Design a protein with these regions (language model features):
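Start-transfer (signal-anchor) and selected internal transmembrane alpha helices
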Residues: 1-19, 170, 180, 286-296, ...
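Signature aromatic-anchored transmembrane alpha helix within multi-pass, membrane-resident enzymes
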Residues: 5-12, 294-298, 302, 379-391, ...
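Transmembrane-helix signature of polytopic, membrane-embedded enzymes
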Residues: 6-10, 150-160, 180-209, 227-228, ...
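Membrane-interface alpha helices of multi-pass inner-membrane proteins
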Residues: 37, 203-204, 208, 236, ...
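Membrane-lumen/periplasm interface segments of multi-pass, membrane-embedded glycan/lipid transferases
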Residues: 102-123, 285-287, 305, 309-373, ...
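Membrane-interface transmembrane helices that cradle and orient dolichyl/undecaprenyl
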Residues: 193, 223, 233-246, 277-281
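Perimembrane helix-loop-helix junctions
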Residues: 236-239, 264-302, 367-378, 423
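Hydrophobic, aromatic-rich transmembrane alpha-helices
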Residues: 357-380, 384, 421-427, 433-441, ...
């Protein structure tokens, strides 16, 4: 094994260990995808009707699933029909056909493990309102886990088995693909650095651990996988062999059925295959290379058309066409897209709420270096491609009505484009090493805090962690949520804001009732003390955020529930505490010390890579 190959192996081990280290718990996005994985493996079908409602046995026993048929289910002899819910809590029956007498409407978002669902009326089946690529990627790992557990007599619906299986599925799909992508990033970075190892290694580690790619490499979402597959397509399309070009097309095609938006970068890569000069000769269209690349894309186009026809009745119908009306804006293109917003552009670039350059300041140098690439004739083609891919995802984000991305540790819709903004960092680490290194350290610290506490950061989105009197721009994911939870065990900045708003309302009620000012002050003081003491104890009322307890792995939601309401298990129970976890917590549960193995293994290996690559340069 050569020195470079050893470095690549160490990069893979360091990143895979880190991405596999965290289980981030449940949430709408990953719960719906995992339901499809289970349906494929356990039932051999795509419909997830039997994997969206979980109940506990009478007397507080194990979990069991409640099957649905045409959006209806039965509990204790009572028939219920699931209903969409709008912001005014109006119920709209999902199945609009006449209901039998005595059937009660039930709000879907309270009962189902996810609200990210689509219901197909002509089949009576539920599906995730997502592209299927992520689910397909998760099938191999879950297939192995499920059949091993079945041979051992384990119940896949048991809380701990379900939780572990979701973790294993995430590791064997998103975690693995993301780590492999880091190796390919390292190879591309070496090419763009002229073979220099240190700038390439530093850029790779800054990308892996200092950008929003890190937390999303630990989640069963599509974003890190899409970015990884597009990066892999870019790597292979730069090779000359027909096999590599086919593989480039396959990676691109898989990216497109993992995130439909990736179809546009797939076209950009086709243009690159057609026009790029890989051997330094004069530019001319290479239709052979492009045809081979597109031949690799074709099977995935056929696959998605077949999937859509089977599940939705037409190759051109998508799951989004059948999702909740809550996600649709009647005045928007495709129900989701509006004119680009300069305010959102500011939010996702420089704000402490979703700002890519605030949360990952090292990418400031990536953007600056991309400009330098554009001025360099030898790199101009690649620079234009990187700019086009990242710029496309940026444009989509600032035009999307759900720009914030829900519960998220950063601008998640930019994650698929991050590899292409980070690749130019090889220039920054070569020319401005100390400045870029300092910004990288700040970036890694931010991303580690966000990943170690909750990669699905709910600040300013979740009703339990939102102050409606504040603009999005003034919210701070790290300063108001991740850091206070890690350092003090509670998100005190937001809790204090919620307490202040609550007491203002209570004081207004007292004043309206004619209570004298001195008495109002006394009562409000007592109320403030009692409520603060309740938050210290972790009580969930009146502030649900008070039940969110640090310092690490704070998400109490499981893969069997869709909302933070502790319907299955009470706050601070063993189950809610272990719905999310990191590997170190098997030794130091609920402790900052749980990060020590991560710092020693991944941190030590990263240090070794940097030192070894610097020695090679010397």
């Amino acid at each position: 094994m050569s020195r470079v190959q050893r470095l690549e192996l160490i990069v893979f081990i360091a990143t895979f260990f880190a991405f596999a280290y965290f289980h981030q718990g449940g949430g709408w996005n990953q719960n719906s995808r995992f339901a499809e994985v289970r349906a494929i493996v356990e039932q051999g079908r795509f419909a997830i009707d039997d994997f969206i409602i979980y109940q506990r046995d009478a007397g507080g026993g194990e979990l069991h699933r409640i099957p649905t048929r045409a959006a209806e289910y039965e509990i204790g002899g009572q028939h219920h029909r699931l209903a969409w819910v709008d912001m005014a809590w109006t119920l709209y029956p999902i199945n609009e056909s006449p209901a039998a007498e005595g059937v009660k409407l039930a709000p879907m978002i309270e009962l189902c493990s996810s609200g990210d669902l689509g219901y197909v009326p002509h089949t009576g089946h539920f599906h995730p309102n997502k592209p299927p690529g992520t689910s397909f990627l998760g099938v191999p790992a879950y297939f192995i886990a499920y059949h091993v557990e079945r041979a051992l007599g384990m119940n896949p619906d048991a809380w701990w088995t379900l939780t572990l299986n979701a973790w294993i599925t995430t590791i064997g799909s998103i975690g693995l693909i993301s780590a492999l992508a880091c190796v390919l990033f390292f190879r591309l970075a070496r090419e763009f650095a002229g073979g220099a190892l240190f700038p390439a290694a530093a850029a790779t580690l800054a990308f892996a651990f200092g950008t929003t790619f890190f937390p999303f490499a630990t989640l069963f979402f599509d974003h890190a996988a899409t970015g990884s597959l597009l990066l892999a397509a870019f790597y292979f399309v730069r090779r000359k062999s027909a096999g590599a070009l086919l593989l480039a097309g396959a990676c691109a095609g898989l990216a497109a059925i993992t995130n439909y938006l990736a179809a546009v970068p797939v076209a950009f890569l086709a243009a690159y295959a057609l026009l790029a000069r890989l051997d330094g000769t004069a530019s001319k269209a290479d239709f052979r290379r492009t045809a081979i690349y597109l031949a690799g894309v074709l099977p995935f186009l056929i696959l998605i058309c077949w999937y859509n026809a089977v599940n939705f009745g037409s190759p051109t119908r998508l799951a989004n066409d059948f999702q909740s009306p809550l996600f649709k804006d009647t005045g928007a293109f495709l129900g989701m897209f509006v004119l680009p917003s300069s305010y959102v552009a500011g939010l996702i670039t420089v704000s402490p709420y979703r700002g890519i350059f605030f949360l990952s300041p090292v990418l400031i140098m990536g953007a600056w270096s991309l400009v330098a690439w554009l001025a360099d004739k030898s790199r101009a083609t690649e620079a234009r491609l990187c700019l086009a891919i990242f710029g496309f995802f940026f444009l989509v984000n600032i035009s999307f009505n759900g720009y914030h991305g829900g519960f998220s540790a950063g601008p998640r819709y930019l994650v698929p484009g991050l590899p292409f903004l980070a690749l130019p960092l090889v220039v920054a680490f070569a020319r401005w090493r100390w400045l870029t290194g300092a910004l990288a350290l700040v970036s890694v610290a931010n991303q580690l805090l966000l990943t170690a506490t909750d990669a699905q950061n709910p600040l300013a989105v979740g009703g339990h962690a939102r102050n409606d009197r504040r603009q999005d721009f003034s919210n701070n994911l790290v300063g108001e949520y991740a850091w206070p939870l890690f350092a003090y065990g509670r998100a005190w900045p937001m809790l204090d804001q919620l307490l202040g708003v609550h007491l203002e309302k209570e004081e207004a009620k007292l004043e309206e009732a004619g209570v004298e000012s001195d008495e109002r002050e006394r009562r409000i003081g007592e109320m403030r003390r009692d409520l603060h003491e309740g938050m210290v104890r972790g009580e969930a009322s009146p502030f649900l955020l008070g039940a969110i307890e640090g310092p690490v792995s704070v998400n109490p939601i499981g893969y069997f529930e869709g909302m933070l309401e502790f319907r299955h298990y009470p706050p601070h129970s063993h189950e809610t505490r272990w719905n999310s976890f990191n590997v170190g917590e098997f030794i130091w549960p609920g402790s900052r010390w749980s990060l020590l193995p991560l710092l020693l293994v991944s941190g030590g290996l990263c240090g070794w890579v940097l030192v070894a690559s610097r020695r090679q340069a010397s």
